[in-house]
């Protein structure tokens, strides 16, 4: 979740045996703040095993490269395409040039590169854009997402690019679901909504308790137009925030996270599987018990 991906939560997930992440969207374009938190994570855990996500053009290529190289990060995720927030795609040729310019030096470090997708990508584009795998969002996912189920996109992507590493993002909250995806060949399984409601997440206790009382049928689907493309967002809406905001609903999100009466938080169908606030250790133990 934008703003929910904090170094404190990442450390807790790592200590619980999970594979944590940090998202550049948390840092308001300040790459030095992301570097600071990454340094803190590595010092606190003694590990560089963390997944970093960036939106194309959000930072300079050099800034992204230096962050990844500083601790030889094993995996990164790039968010780009016709839904790119920071610069709508002018042409596929321009996009390819930009992606290769960013990713070629990073790939040379040995880092595996994932692309966030809402729709399937063919083998030609995967190879052309130097992609190793895909982080797959669908109708069950939190925040910006697609209309087709995660499982359907996952299975289609597996058939189209059998050598790709795949990470499903959305709707997972039980040990049986985790095992099913692992058995289907998932590299790992994301459980962002469940961890967003963990004891260690930055959401206020008031927000967590309010969310636990809800189910996925209570989620709202916002729509935004970015770069002439309409996108939807799955969110738990409190009283609507009426003030100025950006395309990602960041101010409303911060109010929702802090327990204000107006605002929202980005949650997915995984909310159906959260009935109480638990530690990351308890959550990960529960979700991996069938493996």
Regions found by a protein language model. Name each.
Residues 141, 149-165, 173-291:
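Conserved active-site-proximal phosphate/metal-binding subdomains
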Residues 110-119, 171-172, 215, 230:
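Active-site glycine- and acidic-residue-rich loops that bind
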Residues 2, 169-174:
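Gly/Ser-rich catalytic serine loop of serine hydrolases
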Residues 1-165:
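Active-site entrance/lid segments in N-terminal catalytic domains of soluble metabolic enzymes
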């Amino acid at each position: 979740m934008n703003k929910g991906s904090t170094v404190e939560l990442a450390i807790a997930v790592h200590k619980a045996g999970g594979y944590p992440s940090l998202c550049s969207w948390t840092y308001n374009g300040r790459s030095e703040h992301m570097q600071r938190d990454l340094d803190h994570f590595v010092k606190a855990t003694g590990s560089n095993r963390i997944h970093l996500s960036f939106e194309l053009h959000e930072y300079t290529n050099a800034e992204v490269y230096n962050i990844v190289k500083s601790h030889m990060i094993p995996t990164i995720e790039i968010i780009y395409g016709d839904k790119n927030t920071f610069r709508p795609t002018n042409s596929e040729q321009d996009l390819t040039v930009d992606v290769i310019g960013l990713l070629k030096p990073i790939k040379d470090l040995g880092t595996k590169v994932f692309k966030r997708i809402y729709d399937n990508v063919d083998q030609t584009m995967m190879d052309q854009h130097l992609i190793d795998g895909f982080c797959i969002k669908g109708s069950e996912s939190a925040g910006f997402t697609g209309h087709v189920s995660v499982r359907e996109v996952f299975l289609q992507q597996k058939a189209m690019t059998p050598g790709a590493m795949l990470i499903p993002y959305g709707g997972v909250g039980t040990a049986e679901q985790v095992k099913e995806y692992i058995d289907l060949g998932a590299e790992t399984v994301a459980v962002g909504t469940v961890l967003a409601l963990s004891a260690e997440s930055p959401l206020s206790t008031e927000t967590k308790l309010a969310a636990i009382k809800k189910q996925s049928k209570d989620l709202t689907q916002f729509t935004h137009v970015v770069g002439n493309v309409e996108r939807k967002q799955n969110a738990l809406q409190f009283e609507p925030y009426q003030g100025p905001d950006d395309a990602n609903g960041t101010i409303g999100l911060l109010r929702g996270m802090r327990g204000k009466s107006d605002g929202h938080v980005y949650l997915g169908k995984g909310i159906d599987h959260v009935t109480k606030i638990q530690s990351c250790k308890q959550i990960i133990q529960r979700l991996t018990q069938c493996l």
